[in-house]
Amino acid sequence: MVAAQDDGAQRKLAHTLLLELMSYQFASPVRWIETQDVVLGQYRAERIIEIGPAATLTNMIKQTVQSKFLHSDRASLLQRQLLASEKQGKDIYYEDDGVGIGTGAEAPAPSAKTQAQASGGAGTIAGAGSSTAPVTAPPAPAAAKAVPAGGMQAIEDRQAQAFEIVRTLLSRILKIALTDVVGTQSIKSLSGGRSTLENEIIGDLASEFGSLPDRAEDLTVNDLSAALQKTFTGQMRKVILKMLHAMFASKMPGQFTVATARTYLHSRWGLGSGRQDSVLLLAIAQQPGSRLKEEAEARSFFDGLVQFYADEHGLTLGANSGAADETSGLGGGLVMDQKTLAALTGGQQELSKALLKIYAKHLDIDLDGDRRALHDLQATVEKDLRLALDQIHQELGEDFTDGVQPVFSARKARRFDSAWSWALQDLLQLYYEVSRTGGETEVDLAAKRCKHIEDAADPRLLDVLQRIVGRFEQQPVLSSMFTQLAQRCRDSLLHGPRYLARPDQQGPRTTISAEGDITYTEQERAEPVPLADLVYLPKSTEAAPLEPFLHLKQRTGGSSAWTYSHDLTEQYRAVLEQATTVGESFAGRSVLITGAGVGSIGAEVLKGLLAGGARVIVTTSRFSSSVVRKYQDLYTQVGSRGSELVVVPFNQASVQDVTALVNYIYDAQGGLHWDLDHILPFAAMPENGRTIEKIDPHSELAHRTMMVNTLRLLGAVKARKEAQGSRTRPTQVILPLSPNHGVFGGDGLYSESKLGLEALFNRWHSEDWSDYLSVCGAVIGWTRGTGLMSGNNLVAEGIEELGCRTFSQQEMAQCLLCLMFNTMCSLCEEAPLYADLSGRMGAVQNLRQKVQELRTEINETANTRRALLEELAMEARCSEGPTPTIDSEPAKATATPTLTAHVRLDFPPTVDYNQEIKPLTADLQGMVDLDRVVVVTGFGEIGPWGNARTRWEMEAYGEFSLEGCVEMAWLMGLIRYENSSSPGWVDAKTNERVHDHEVKHKYEEHILSHTGIRLIEPDRFGANYHPEHKQLLHEVLIQEDFPELEVPEATAQQMKLEHGNKVDIIPDPEGGDQCRVVLKKGAKLMVPKALRLDRMVIGQIPTGWDARKYGIPEDVISQVDPVTLYMLACSIEALLSSGITDPYEIYRYIHVSEAGNCVGSSLGGFNSLQQMYRGRYMEKEVQKDILQETFVNTIGAWMNMLLMSSAGPIRTPVGACATAIESVELGYDTLISGKAKFCFVGGGDDFGEEVLYEFANMKATANTVDEFEQGREASEMSRPAASTRNGFMESHGCGVQILTTARLAIEMGLPVRGVIAFVETSSDKASRSVPAPGRGILSKAREVRSSSPSSSLISSPLLNISNRRKRLDFRKKQIEFARETALEELQLEIAHVEESEVEDYIRERTAQINAEAQKDLRNAQYHLGNAFWQNDPSIAPLRGALAVWGLTIDDLDVASFHGTSTKLNEKNECSLIQAQLSHLGRAKGNVILGVFQKYLTGHPKGAAGAWMLNGALQILDTGIVPGNRNLDNVEAELQKNEQIAFLNRSLDTGRGSMRAVSVTSFGFGQKGAQTIVVHPKYLFATLEEQEYEEYLDKRAKRQKKADSFFYRGLASNRLFELKTAPPWAPQKELETLLDPTPPQTNVDDRVARSIVQQESAEP
């Protein structure tokens, strides 16, 4: 009946039935007690499931079971399972990780208590929090015997031994392999005497085993293990369990727990719990490097450990192949695999699906309807789109559709307008070149530079020229040259820059040698004819008169034909002459050029416009850093005062780009806001080889580019001019026409494109845009060397013989530029002009045929000569016999020698005494106290470009030499030296021999890709670090109870401590150390999330750099922070750079208390800080003594412990980015005060994502994403002083210098690289900004000014070194008089001495008197030499420090700037240096050369000043002043700093020409620092000639020894000698430290022998 009813009746009936049933339910008694009796008693139900929102009924049933059925259930062994769907869904659906019965991998025999319970003893019911609630304890399963699942024969179990635990602990703590834990060694010997490690090991052993034997650290591992075994229970305890669980938590897949591993070891390998412990101990010691992702990987990992264990213990194990496929994560011996579980649950899933379909059918719901509708819609849309795209591709072709893609981006625009800076740079380069060569320089190049200097000159350039003229007073020729240049600059300042044409009068020349080689050259024409003369009509003997090579045409009457116009041509001739005489100014004009690729006619036009002062926007379709750099170089060479060049990416085939380009030019907001005066649409595309039947999509694309979109471009300009009402300033359009109207053929639609442009001549009259655009068509002739015509260069000479004139690019550019002169522009505004610049190409009949004939003739002539030569050679062979083969002796004798790399330490060259030193001795000899003069004898560096030597090659020369490539390849682990029967370099991977000359070719590309400033290479900074995936933690409150987690009991208690009642702990019913935890609703979780950082580029040390290369041992590498490793390597470099191969050598000259260390850092051991905070927080494995590695002073401590073993002063500067120069100040003060005579200084820092992130938050660093969007490469992103700079680039590494007293350096023969003349730090004014740029170092120029009107004429007489010398001479006489007086009084003194002691008394007293006299003399030298200026308010510290060496502020040649590439730093720093120089009276025009090193290295914080100081010393050494190659355009605001020259290329000033260099450094926290280093020749001038010669002899021997040691170190990777004992014998420690007498008497004999052996070693 129901079935027969319709749907409405059925719903009504169902509603009525529901109401009746609910009424019955509410009206009837519950009868819950009776229901339970029936279910539990009558039916004896074992599995009861409650479906509902809470476990209400389940809890009631539990109480009933406890009160009524507990004893009967035990008696009958009945087990009940009570489940609630709200909590135990997985158990209900059998979806848990597994179902098992048993105790673990191998269940032990049931205990007596368990057996009693199984016989009916009392059991317990699990609490309400249990996932399953067994009512009674189950009996021990029969399967839990000694037979594993799978039926495999069990292995006899054996407890883990104490030795295994001891070995595991030692392996993990010492970070060594298990095989390196030798049983016969003690803990003390294994830890290398590191007490911290010893204490950690002993503490962990005590925690694990309880009491330990006395002096456990001195027992061998075997003896210690045997002693511990006596009381060892065989159970893993606190320390090992913590390591075990940490290993599983960090290295195993999420579901692979300790219990899972035990189950697997039991089921697959039959291992009992004891042997499982042994394998787990192996896992702790040999854990994988990173987390295993799949359980299969984990099982494979444990398989390997089992095999290792079996081999170690001589076991033969057979694996149960089926066990590996079973589900993991089970706690018992019975295992239910996935197939069985699927079989159990599969029926339920099928039933659910069937019910769903029935309900859907009943409700008339189509379950697949929406999916089908969406699929049909998607298919329809996709089909239509695909059809449309296919039609477009078929119609237009792939070349066309790809070729019209837009590329324009206003963000990528590059602007160049700092011509003033490049003019000064050209002037300085010209000056130093003529100074070095005595005036012998390339004439043409000098003339071009002079023209550029003239065009771009500003008033300060005149001051520089005036000073240069003064320096060449004794050289009349050079003085005259610069005087004339100065006059032309003055004229240019009066009249403005002008374009002046000086094209080369050269013609084409094709020659064919006797060997048949074809050569094309440009040679001076035999009869040069100026371009202006090419407009004259030639004499014609033909019936039809010939037109001039260059002429203008006009229309006659109403005809559309163009004919020669004498009047217009005469006007054109006048401007051609004007171009070579007075020129033309383009100042104030705005020009657009498309198609001005380097080497094109457009590029030459661009040069002329820039030389004339125009603003030009040029487009390029191949926008890249290399292309932009070519335009930058072009502007640098020719840009004049007021000119500007803008380069943008642009595809003229794209309509979108045409619109965007014009908008960018005219828009005031975000654009240039220009109104164009000229447009040169020169963009073209070659179409070679395309005849009429081969017109293809490329031809259409070219036609669109050269004609269609040219018209669109002009239309867009017209629209913008009309919109802004610009009717009185029409834009001149130079249309690039062609005489090739199909004459050549085979060039696609090229001629049609050019002919199409000629229609504009008529449209100018017929349309409404003549007020906005004027038109000048230029028929461009045969131009040699362009992209379109370079292939025809060989026939150009022959073409000229046919009566056609060919042009160079410069000549054609002049012709076109003259069309833009004011005269021609005025003519264009009246009517379109037609300029025929074809050189009468159209007059040559059958041009294509003629060209082919010429080409054929050339090739035939060449082939004939080659054949003739070959025939002659054959005749010679036949008449003279066989020629020698390549293997014959003569051939070998004449083989070209291969290049050999001479990698060596860069000792500075010796200074010639007569030429460079002697002229200074008159003032300086004997004028300073050498014990209080501080010199730099050596330096080291680890940075993005390797060491200091390789960094200098890139900084000074822009490329690596062969030696630089060899050293970098060694440093990066690409090659190694093999000492075999045939020693030499071999490839580190293939072991193939690599000759020296092959290294650069083979490895340079790889080296350049993995050095310098580049995208972050995550592998260097931790396995889980990537800048695009910075991990952060997000706190959440969970909304429902989590599924159970299996964790160690200790972890569970810790979670309980943190979360309180939000955590339920379910103990393991078998009493194991694992338990289950339920995180309840409301618990707090920290969920990892990732942040995409936009700082992805930094300066990084070379990929592959490894401290092992220096011989630093593995135990040190594993112990110390990377910054310490950098500092150790730097210290080794610095020592070798000083010629010191064994640091203990210095103790033959000074006491151990006189060697100091002042190295510092801004952050210290940053990697260790990360581990200490993040690693500990995340419970990663971290060494126990990590705290000590975080201290800044630990770096210097390791240097002393492993290298120096000194007892001298140790001071640790922390000055942020100014740390290194602050370190120099500390070292300087330490030496000047006499506390030390030898000192390490410098700084170092590492990189970390935390610092990167925080600098980004401060907006201090450049945004990498923005930089890439602007078209910058990684290497360009640090641009100090550039107008587009936008933040610094982080970097890392370290730098070290060795400072000594001058006397020690001379005594030891150490190389003197520079004198520290001055170094001080300064704080700043009141502020609230820690990183604000400081002004404090201005105080280094402080001095009292006289109130006299002529105060500039008054200065302290002490500044005159002659005055000081007179005073010193007088003081010397006083000292000598005092000494003589004391010696005379000695006779009175001995009257009171016993006769037997008189001789000794006289000798000792005489020595004392002489020593006092020497001390007085040194004090006099110091106070009248080194420190005469100190505490004198009338002498500025900078002025006084220079005056010590006879120098003035005008002798400060170079300033090395901190230059971080931030907006504020350069403005502040440059203004500071400018203020210092001006205040101290530096002469006008005497510019200081600015160096901005961080463009190359990035900003390494603590190491910054050290790298800059190293560079400053290299400048003094070589005379090369490096340019800032990333300085594409100097910020306009920096132009006001008239005393500073900003360079973007290196200047070679000549070796020995640099006198003093300033280095400034600034750090967060008000740290400002400045130091001045002076050339060592000024120090040598204080010595007698004999002293200097003796010093050179010592230095030469030292250099020879150091080079030999360095060669051997490179070959053996042993540049570092680990010091294991101090330089004195153990029994002499007290004597050595307390006795200040000559230290060599206390140096250990073994050390002395080592030094002697090194000195006698052959190189």
Curated annotation (Swiss-Prot):
The protein, known as: Fatty acid synthase subunit alpha
Subunit relationships: [Alpha(6)beta(6)] hexamers of two multifunctional subunits (alpha and beta).
Native organism: Emericella nidulans (strain FGSC A4 / ATCC 38163 / CBS 112.46 / NRRL 194 / M139)
Pathway stated in the Swiss-Prot or TrEMBL entry: Secondary metabolite biosynthesis
Active site: C1217 (for beta-ketoacyl synthase activity), H1458 (for beta-ketoacyl synthase activity), H1499 (for beta-ketoacyl synthase activity)
One CC-aspect GO term: fatty acid synthase complex
Renumbered residue ranges of the record's region Ketoreductase (KR) domain: 588-826
Region (Disordered): 114-139, 1631-1659
Keyword Transferase included in the entry's annotation: yes
EC number(s) per entry: 2.3.1.86, 1.1.1.100, 2.3.1.41
Disruption phenotype: Eliminates more than 99.5% of aspercryptin production.
Domain of life: Eukaryota
Domain Carrier intervals: 160-235
Role according to the record: Fatty acid synthase subunit alpha; part of the gene cluster that mediates the biosynthesis of aspercryptins, linear lipopeptides built from six amino acids including 2 highly unusual and nonproteogenic amino acids, 2-amino-octanoic acid (2aoa) and 2-amino-dodecanol (2adol). The core structure of aspercryptins is as follows: Ser/Ala-Thr-Ile/Val-2aoa-Asn-2adol. The first step of aspercryptin biosynthesis is the generation of the fatty acid precursors, octanoic and dodecanoic acids, by the FAS subunits atnF and atnM.
Keywords of this entry: Fatty acid biosynthesis, Fatty acid metabolism, Lipid biosynthesis, Lipid metabolism, Multifunctional enzyme, NADP, Oxidoreductase, Phosphopantetheine, Phosphoprotein, Transferase
Residue positions where O-(pantetheine 4'-phosphoryl)serine is found in the record: S195
GO biological process: long-chain fatty acid biosynthetic process
Reactions the enzyme catalyzes: acetyl-CoA + n malonyl-CoA + 2n NADPH + 4n H(+) = a long-chain-acyl-CoA + n CoA + n CO2 + 2n NADP(+); a fatty acyl-[ACP] + malonyl-[ACP] + H(+) = a 3-oxoacyl-[ACP] + holo-[ACP] + CO2; a (3R)-hydroxyacyl-[ACP] + NADP(+) = a 3-oxoacyl-[ACP] + NADPH + H(+)
PTM description: 4'-phosphopantetheine is transferred from CoA to a specific serine of the acyl carrier domain by the C-terminal PPT domain. This modification is essential for activity because fatty acids are bound in thioester linkage to the sulfhydryl of the prosthetic group.
Induction: Expression is positively regulated by the aspercryptin cluser-specific transcription factor atnN.
Record family assignment: Belongs to the thiolase-like superfamily. Fungal fatty acid synthetase subunit alpha family.
Location of the Ketosynthase family 3 (KS3) domain: 1030-1575
Gene3D superfamilies (UniProt xref): 3.30.70.2490, 3.40.47.10, 3.90.25.70, 6.10.140.1410, 6.10.250.1930, NAD(P)-binding Rossmann-like Domain (3.40.50.720)
UniProt GO MF annotations: 3-oxoacyl-[acyl-carrier-protein] reductase (NADPH) activity; 3-oxoacyl-[acyl-carrier-protein] synthase activity; fatty acid synthase activity; fatty-acyl-CoA synthase activity; holo-[acyl-carrier-protein] synthase activity
Alphabetized SUPFAM superfamilies for the sequence: FabD/lysophospholipase-like (SSF52151), NAD(P)-binding Rossmann-fold domains (SSF51735), Thiolase-like (SSF53901)
